[in-house]
Amino acid sequence: MNLHEAITEWKDTPESHARFNDVFAAKVNEDPKLKDYRDWIERNIFGFGERSFIWMWKLLIDELPKDFKFLEIGVFRGQILGAVRMLAPKADITGITPLTSEGGHWESDYKADIKLLHDTFNLEQPKIIKGLSTDKEVIELAGKESYDIVYIDGGHTYEIAKSDVWVYSSFVKVGGYLVIDDCCHKYDLPSGQFKGIEEVSKAVDELLPNGFYKELFSIVHVRVFIRIK
């Protein structure tokens, strides 16, 4: 399944949501490198989300130039930054993170965690903007660039989620992708699939889609939008 097929075939039904998750996860497991990566993430608790999400990233990355720019808000221990680097060795990859337990995570040396993950898989280290996504200095620094993909998985309160979508969606290039985690309460997911965080879903639904963004598809609790103008 390529991106065009995913967009065409997506439906908001329990059966469709279950199929997408199963097909995407199977694709990851068919690729030894991606399977080993996700297995390591799960074994060492270096990230959450679904195995299927890695294939979502591959579908988006396949549509972009090799040196595309990627920004993640909310890095945790680096799972997504590492996956994107594995799929796109020449990409320009940046993460925004306070490198602390902010948001309810356990205490850890998050800078060392991110380095360990990338070293383990012989991946080039990402650029890190240290701070909160709502910090003026962080916004100014991140806003010096425009990005082919912005991934929002930061603070899970209504206020922070709405701020992140409002601010960072403006940094996406026309034709680029805005990907948001934990925001699928409006969808008819099958029993057992996590819809995300209700406050995050509310914030996203109030802002998207709009005249600048069209929704393409979702996978479990992640939604994918494309900037159209």
Q: What is each PLM-predicted segment?
A:
Residues 3-10, 24-48, 54-229:
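S-adenosylmethionine/decaboxylated-SAM
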Residues 10, 14-20:
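Long, compositionally biased, charged low-complexity segments
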